[in-house]
A protein has these predicted regions:
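Long, basic/Gly/Ser/Thr-rich N-terminal segments
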Residues: 1-39
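Glycine-rich, often proline-containing surface loops adjacent to acidic residues and nearby aromatics
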Residues: 1, 89, 247-251
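Residue-level "edge-of-site" marker
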Residues: 19, 128, 148
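P-loop NTPase motor domains
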Residues: 25, 29-81, 132, 136-141, ...
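Short, charged/polar micro-motifs that form catalytic or ligand-binding hotspots
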Residues: 1, 100-101, 294
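Hydrophobic, Leu/Ile/Phe/Ala-enriched alpha-helical segments that form helix-helix packing faces
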Residues: 2-10, 114, 195, 275
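Glycine-rich phosphate-binding loop of nucleotide-binding enzymes
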Residues: 65-145
Length: 308
């Protein structure tokens, strides 16, 4: 009768016999090991209960660099995660998140960790000086392109080499076209002849000021004048030697420069060309913080597409 009443209330009861003592002990507080039952399960039910899978802990090695993963990170669980940017030989990475979520901190951390690889190079285009502290802490160079004395480039430094002279021709033609001057085949031929004359001069004489002085076309001189020391952007491009120098860790603050579209394209083209000469097979990390700002710029957007 007791069993009937209990079952009627929705409880499942069983009359114990040989297991009566264990069942009674298991009902008392503190007896955790008494009345341990091992019910018989069907195989399909058991398969659903068994832990046959686990959290993916990331790749064990970076096969492209034949080295360990970039870094070991903590997770919400008990399994750490091996973070690596490469999928095969492709290391393109995009980090998206709300303002203040820590994207710049993560980028700086990735840049610091990347130096674990032998002969690694890190070049970072910054906005708001978010990476300045860690770059200087790593012994790197930080160039604020809005600072009058931060950086000086000499785009014509190596024009004695045919490949460099060809690049310089395209660069000058781009500056002239950006000034709404039509670059005709005859003008390109004249630009090339001027470059050949300049290439025969000593390296320290290969400046934009001398190039403008050698140019015969008035439209060419007018278009290039803003980039000489007679104009507002000569401090960046009209030098008799490059102050950039080689460094395995370098960052460039772009905030002020990106507010000056006329200068941004010219400076970025020359700066990218210098960096591309360093992409010689060494492990290289190129970081663009606040990339949306750079994608808005026509030249920078085209350069990113070329890299990708």
């Amino acid at each position: 009768q007791i069993q009937q009443v209990t079952d009627g209330l929705g409880f499942v009861t069983q009359v114990e016999s040989v297991n009566a003592v264990e069942a009674w002990l298991g009902s008392l507080p503190g007896h955790a090991y008494a009345d341990v039952r091992r019910p018989i399960l069907m195989t399909p039910s058991l398969a659903h209960l068994l832990p046959t899978s686990a959290v993916w802990a990331g790749p064990e090695r970076n096969h492209h660099l034949n080295a360990p993963p970039l870094m070991l990170t903590a997770t919400d669980g008990a399994t750490p995660f091996r973070l690596d940017l490469h999928v095969g030989d492709v290391g393109h990475t995009m980090i998206v998140g709300p303002t203040g979520a820590g994207k710049s901190v993560l980028l700086a951390t990735l840049a610091a960790q990347f130096l674990r690889y032998p002969d690694a190079q890190v070049y970072l285009f910054d906005k708001g000086r978010s990476a300045r502290a860690i770059l200087l802490g790593l012994g790197g160079d930080f160039f604020d392109l809005g600072d009058e004395h931060a950086l000086g480039l000499q785009p014509f430094e190596c024009i004695h080499e045919p490949e460099e002279r060809a690049w310089a021709l395209d660069w000058i033609a781009g500056l002239i076209a950006a000034a709404n001057v039509s670059v005709t085949p005859e003008m390109r031929a004249e630009l090339w002849r001027t470059l050949e004359i300049l290439s025969a001069r000593p390296v320290e004489d290969r400046t934009l000021t001398l190039y403008v002085a050698l140019a015969q076309d008035g439209e060419v001189r007018a278009a290039l004048q803003p980039f000489t020391h007679a104009g507002p952007y000569g401090r960046l491009l009209d030098h008799d030697h490059s102050t950039l120098g080689y460094g395995a860790v370098q960052a460039f603050e772009m905030d002020d420069l990106m507010r000056r579209p006329q200068a941004a394209g010219a400076v970025l083209a020359a700066l990218f060309h210098v960096l591309e000469r360093r992409f010689d097979g060494k492990p290289t990390l190129l970081v663009l913080d606040e990339a949306w700002l750079f994608v808005k710029d026509a030249f920078f957007s085209a350069q990113i597409q070329d890299w990708l």
